[in-house]
């Protein structure tokens, strides 16, 4: 990633759009469809770089996967007929692929090596490896914490485990490993995190029960899996950039259709409402993965907000763009309990404060979040995504607060989760 992109977009933003399919659900749909015997079709998936890495890995395991227009066709021999790969399974920049497959592959009686790019090589894996070993997994890594991860055949046991971090990736790794156990498992969350793995297990016929923060899987659960067609809602993490863009750009009025509003993911909607932003959800569907059309209008005089506790895991990936939104509030906002930001593609506490600080915004990083003061785009500077897709898109939205173009280095990082992000933003500008 080396390219530099000049962003020169002016408001108002007007119109109706859809955003790409949900990244979390696309990963999980590919994994579950590959484990099941037979054909599954995944409609409206995200075909960003992260999800393509997941697809390539299952191809190496012997699954036939075809990409067609707005769908993925998975034709699998089933988990018990996977073949041992004869090369490293490359996960690229995808923490989801790396951590979830650490659990899934641990139960497959295969010799595998998982490795990613330089960013993945810096992200902690002990949070997954330690509980997987308690389940009997044979998994090792560099300094017992970093990729590449070496996974060898092992017999997986059930586990009763209290999560030490509020991480959907760790939870999901354990749930995938538990599919191959002869015993039941009970996992208790620290705080409720995104529950796509649980809802999608049910859709692929895998028995699972949930009571508050407790999740219980059944013995030999993998034997119940069935091929299934799956429709992927639009990604609320991608919609978040357009939500904030409309809120901070005078005269804007946009509608984003078919966005997933799973209550474990929709923290940004709750936060915008706390700030008294003009946002409403229309055409809500009543399913295990609900969707809505989200209409957002420019809102001056936003209220400052304290973001802490249970809402943080429900908005963890959106916190950088929410931090930008908070600079436009009428008072000081605070984000707390967000230590997980430190172990994303970058330390997003520091990169958010540093990159917005270069433009004159006033944010103070703390050990677990940010203090954000009302501030303006005061000076022009060349900024950098630092290869983090969400930082790149956040900076592009920040440019709407300036009358001058903004140059962003390594902007192609946005292709990890949102190919076509800039043309979509320009479409709203042109309609306005």
Swiss-Prot record:
Keywords linked to the UniProt accession: Amino-acid biosynthesis, Aromatic amino acid biosynthesis, Cytoplasm, Transferase
PANTHER family reported in the protein's UniProt record: AROM/DEHYDROQUINATE SYNTHASE, PENTAFUNCTIONAL AROM POLYPEPTIDE
Residues at the catalytic site: 317 (proton acceptor)
One Pfam family it belongs to: EPSP_synthase
Superkingdom of the source species: Bacteria
GO biological process: amino acid biosynthetic process; aromatic amino acid family biosynthetic process; chorismate biosynthetic process
Main function: Catalyzes the transfer of the enolpyruvyl moiety of phosphoenolpyruvate (PEP) to the 5-hydroxyl of shikimate-3-phosphate (S3P) to produce enolpyruvyl shikimate-3-phosphate and inorganic phosphate.
Pathway: Metabolic intermediate biosynthesis; chorismate biosynthesis; chorismate from D-erythrose 4-phosphate and phosphoenolpyruvate: step 6/7
Protein family membership: Belongs to the EPSP synthase family.
Binding site for 3-phosphoshikimate: 23-24, 28, 167, 169, 317, 344
Assembly, per entry: Monomer.
GO cellular component: cytoplasm
Localization: Cytoplasm
Disulfide bonds: none
Molecular-function GO term, any one: 3-phosphoshikimate 1-carboxyvinyltransferase activity
Catalysis performed (reactions): 3-phosphoshikimate + phosphoenolpyruvate = 5-O-(1-carboxyvinyl)-3-phosphoshikimate + phosphate
Protein name (database record): 3-phosphoshikimate 1-carboxyvinyltransferase
Keyword Transmembrane part of the UniProt annotation: no
Enzyme class of the recorded protein, top EC level: transferase
Positions contributing to phosphoenolpyruvate binding: 23, 95, 123, 169, 348, 390
Enzyme nomenclature, EC number: 2.5.1.19
Chief place of localization: cytoplasm
């Amino acid at each position: 990633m080396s390219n530099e992109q000049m962003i020169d977009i002016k408001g108002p933003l007007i119109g109706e759009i859809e955003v790409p399919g949900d990244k979390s659900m696309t990963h999980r749909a590919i994994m579950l469809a590959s484990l099941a015997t037979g054909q599954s079709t995944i409609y409206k998936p995200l075909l960003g770089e992260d999800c393509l890495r997941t697809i390539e890995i299952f191809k190496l395991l012997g699954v036939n996967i075809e990409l067609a227009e707005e769908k993925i066709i998975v034709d699998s021999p089933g988990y018990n007929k996977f073949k041992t790969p004869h090369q490293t399974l490359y996960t690229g920049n995808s923490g989801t692929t790396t951590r979830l497959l650490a659990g899934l592959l641990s139960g497959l009686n295969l010799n595998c090596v998982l490795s990613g790019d330089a960013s993945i090589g810096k992200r902690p894996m002990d949070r997954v490896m330690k509980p997987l070993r308690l389940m009997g997994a044979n998994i090792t890594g560099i300094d017992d914490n970093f990729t590449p991860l070496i996974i060898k055949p092992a017999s997986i046991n059930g586990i009763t485990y209290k999560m030490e971090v509020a991480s959907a990736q760790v939870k999901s790794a354990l749930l995938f490993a538990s599919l191959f156990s002869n015993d039941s498992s009970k996992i208790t969350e620290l705080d409720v995190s995104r529950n796509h793995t649980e809802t999608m297990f049910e859709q692929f016929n895998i028995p699972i029960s949930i009571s508050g923060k407790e999740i219980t899987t059944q013995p030999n659960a993998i034997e119940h899996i069935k091929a299934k067609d799956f429709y992927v809602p639009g990604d609320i993490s991608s919609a978040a950039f357009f939500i904030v863009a409309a809120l901070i750009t005078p005269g804007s009025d946009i509608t984003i259709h078919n966005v997933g509003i799973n209550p474990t993911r929709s923290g940004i909607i709750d936060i915008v409402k706390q700030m008294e932003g003009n946002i409403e959800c229309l055409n809500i569907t009543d399913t295990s993965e609900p969707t809505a059309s989200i209409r957002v209008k420019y809102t001056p005089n936003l209220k400052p907000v304290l973001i802490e506790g249970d809402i943080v895991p429900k908005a963890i990936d959106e916190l950088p763009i929410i931090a930008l939104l908070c600079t436009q509030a009428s008072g000081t906002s605070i984000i707390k309990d967000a230590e997980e930001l430190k172990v994303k593609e970058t330390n997003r506490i520091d990169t958010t404060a540093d990159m917005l600080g270069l433009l004159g915004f006033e944010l103070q990083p703390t050990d677990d979040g940010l203090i954000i003061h009302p501030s303006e785009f005061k000076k022009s500077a060349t900024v950098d995504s630092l290869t983090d897709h969400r930082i790149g898109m956040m900076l592009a939205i920040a440019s709407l607060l300036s009358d001058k173009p903004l140059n962003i280095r390594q902007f192609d990082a946005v292709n990890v989760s949102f190919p076509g992000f800039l043309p979509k933003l320009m479409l709203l500008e042109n309609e306005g």
